[in-house]
């Protein structure tokens, strides 16, 4: 890392993580982790069914909060710090936010697909001892990932993503 300081300012640059990529990447990666935890929670052991429901609700609320907070914070930073040449561009901010809503579920899906095919560790599912339950959690994850990957172009808010997750879980449970 590099630290640059003057009398009134300090900047820290970590060159290892200096990356300019899609705005929705980090958010998508984190949401993907929460989705995998949600799928695991559907099938791993809990002290009670009430505990399972509470944890699943917590995960969905966390996804909602993350997305909404990201969008609000991005908008506030844009309004406060955007360069002058972008300030007057009608619809640019909305276009960027919509792009995040399209990209983020795609990245969430990709991280879980890689985990499902054992390209990277899947600790959320590794704690599920029952092989059938573990398989069901993996299949549910793949179904949700598929659903959000191909449904993402219609998402306008976190609610749309969460509706997809809940809807796919409900349909999957009917097949068990």
Descriptions of predicted regions:
Residues 1-25:
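Active-site acidic catalytic loop and adjacent metal/ATP-binding pocket
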Residues 24-81, 108-126:
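Active-site activation/catalytic loop segments of kinase-like enzymes and analogous catalytic loops
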Residues 43-46, 86, 132-133:
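Sparse recognition of residues in long alpha-helices and their boundaries
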Residues 8-15, 85-100:
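Short amphipathic alpha-helical segments and their helix-coil junctions
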């Amino acid at each position: 890392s590099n630290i640059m300081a003057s009398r009134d300012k300090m900047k820290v640059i970590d060159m290892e993580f200096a990356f300019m990529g899609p705005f929705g990447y980090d958010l998508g990666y984190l949401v993907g982790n929460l989705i995998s935890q949600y799928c695991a929670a559907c099938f791993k052991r809990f002290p009670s069914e009430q505990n399972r429901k509470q944890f699943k609700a917590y995960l969905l609320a966390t996804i909602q909060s993350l997305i909404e907070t990201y969008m609000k914070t991005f908008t506030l930073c844009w309004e406060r710090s955007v360069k002058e040449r972008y300030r007057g561009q009608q619809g640019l901010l909305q276009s960027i936010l919509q792009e995040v809503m399209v990209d983020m579920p795609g990245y969430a899906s990709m991280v879980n697909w890689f985990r499902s095919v054992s390209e990277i560790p899947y600790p959320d599912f590794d704690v599920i001892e029952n092989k059938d339950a573990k398989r069901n959690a993996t299949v549910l994850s793949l179904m949700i990932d598929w659903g959000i990957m191909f449904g993402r172009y219609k998402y306008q808010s976190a609610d749309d993503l969460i509706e997809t997750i809940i809807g796919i879980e409900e349909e999957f449970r009917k097949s068990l």
